[in-house]
Amino acid sequence: MDWKEILRRRLATPSTSPHKKKSEQELKDEEMDLFTKYYSEWKGGRKNTNEFYKTIPRFYYRLPAEDEVLLQKLREESRAVFLQRKSRELLDNEELQNLWFLLDKHQTPPMIGEEAMINYENFLKVGEKAGPKCKQFFTAKVFAKLLHTDSYGRISIMQFFNYVMRKVWLHQTRIGLSLYDVAGQGYLRESDLENYILELIPTLPQLDGLEKSFYSFYVCTAVRKFFFFLDPLRTGKIKIQDILACSFLDDLLELRDEELSKESQETNWFSAPSALRVYGQYLNLDKDHNGMLSKEELSRYGTATMTNVFLDRVFQECLTYDGEMDYKTYLDFVLALENRKEPAALQYIFKLLDIENKGYLNVFSLNYFFRAIQELMKIHGQDPVSFQDVKDEIFDMVKPKDPLKISLQDLINSNQGDTVTTILIDLNGFWTYENREALVANDNENSTDLDDT
């Protein structure tokens, strides 16, 4: 082709051009095709470098249905074998005694008082001699955790041994609880925890005096504490990890001590005296002996000075049967009122105080409940206190983020939630708060008189 022809084609108009000019849409389509081509090549190159990218890993395992009996049995057996293997990996009593002997043999002088110490070099020597089961405890991380202010860079042998004992106990307990985890997903339902505690009762000497007819009420009393505090969303299940992390299991297993003091038993919710006290109160309130509590019967709880407005809210919000409360619902009520400083208890009471269901308390809510306190004061021949004064005191105590609203988190953060709720629901509690200075003065006078005698 000569240069004349080339020039003619170059100068040709669109209508006479042998190649049509591409439209904007065609250019976009071509660009997308090129992008897809090059992106696919690049992505394909990545796939070739790592076989893992070719498949999506499985992250969901369906639980066997009720009619899939064989699959259920297979799952149960495999879990049982797995838990048995984990149990065999733990230190037994003989191995723990051997560990103590090795630690005592390799202690590093000088002693601090009567406390034996060990340095890092001897610590590693014991780890080598103690066997493979102990390997996880003899790490630099564990040593550093227990290292405090010793000038020789040593740790306490007793503290380390207690650490090992605690770890072994936690693993043993986790395995024990997992045996009752029917679903095998790391949590216990209410019925699972009931079975665990029921089978635990014979191993607790402090519960030997309980009659078997009371076992069901005891189990209900014990289980409610776990679920009230560890299941705030009321899902009906608790993580095994949460059970191990809280102190409730320690309190329950404390009942293994045959010489547990009377004071410890009185303050332990799981003790026989405590369970009998709570159930006895329930029976005393149940005047018509129908096994349930009406609003009138519940009004006699404690000092019998709770307001009718608050009790109305209890029966509106809590689960009742024909307008009456059963023992399980009563336990939640008792746990909330006896532990008002705890977030779970404050959440329970806050829900009752939040009459508009807005997630916060405003002046209207406070006035609604305090009016009932003022009415009770009149009935008892006392001069009613001004609501404005009480309202200002409450907001000063709580110091909410919003100056016109008090949220549940505000109550928890203020550490005054127990005082605020008591002022609003219980005349005796309000009177105690109002006369707190006089009561403190009387206590001081009484203590002075005792000192003089």
Swiss-Prot record:
Residues 273-308, 341-376 form the EF-hand domain. It is found in: Nucleus; Cytoplasm. Ca(2+) binds at residues 286, 288, 290, 292, 297. CDD domains: PPP2R3C. PROSITE patterns: EF_HAND_1. GO terms for molecular function: metal ion binding. GO terms for cellular component: centrosome; cytoplasm; nucleus. Pfam families: EF-hand_13. Keywords: Calcium, Cytoplasm, Metal-binding, Nucleus, Repeat. Its main location: nucleus. GO terms for biological process: B cell homeostasis; cortical cytoskeleton organization; microtubule cytoskeleton organization; positive regulation of B cell differentiation; regulation of dephosphorylation; T cell homeostasis. Interacts with MCM3AP/GANP, PPP5C, and the phosphatase 2A core enzyme composed of the PPP2CA catalytic subunit and the constant regulatory subunit PPP2R1A. Finds in a complex with ABCB1, TFPI2 and PPP2R3C; leading to the dephosphorylation of ABCB1. May regulate MCM3AP phosphorylation through phosphatase recruitment. May act as a negative regulator of ABCB1 expression and function through the dephosphorylation of ABCB1 by TFPI2/PPP2R3C complex. May play a role in the activation-induced cell death of B-cells. This is Serine/threonine-protein phosphatase 2A regulatory subunit B'' subunit gamma.
